[in-house]
Amino acid sequence: SGQNTTNLLTVSFRSDATQGALADLLMRHQLVIVDGPSALRLYRLEVSKDQDPVAVALALRRETGLIESVEVSR
C-alpha cells in the first residue's frame, strides 16, 4: 500500500457539551474518537479518508456551542 497519512484532529469540547450533542456532531462530520480525553480534556479524532481534515477543522470551529479548539494533527 502507498503512503499512509493519518487524518487526525486534536479537539477540545466545551465542558457543558452533552454526550448526545457530541455523538451527533461526530456522526455529522464522520469522525471517530481514537484517543482521549487527555488530562487537558483533548481528544484525537480521525477524519474519514474521503474528507479533507482542514475543511473538517474549519467546519468544527463554527460549532462554537460544542467545540473549544480544533487543531489538525500531522
Regions found by a protein language model. Give the residues of each.
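Juxtamembrane extracytoplasmic segments of single-/few-pass membrane proteins
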Residues: 1-42
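Conserved short beta-strand edge segments in small beta-sheet-based binding/regulatory domains
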Residues: 34-37, 64-74
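Short amphipathic alpha-helices in soluble, non-transmembrane regions
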Residues: 22-29, 53-65
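A generic structural motif
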Residues: 41-49
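Helix N-cap motif at beta-to-alpha junctions
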Residues: 15-18, 48-54
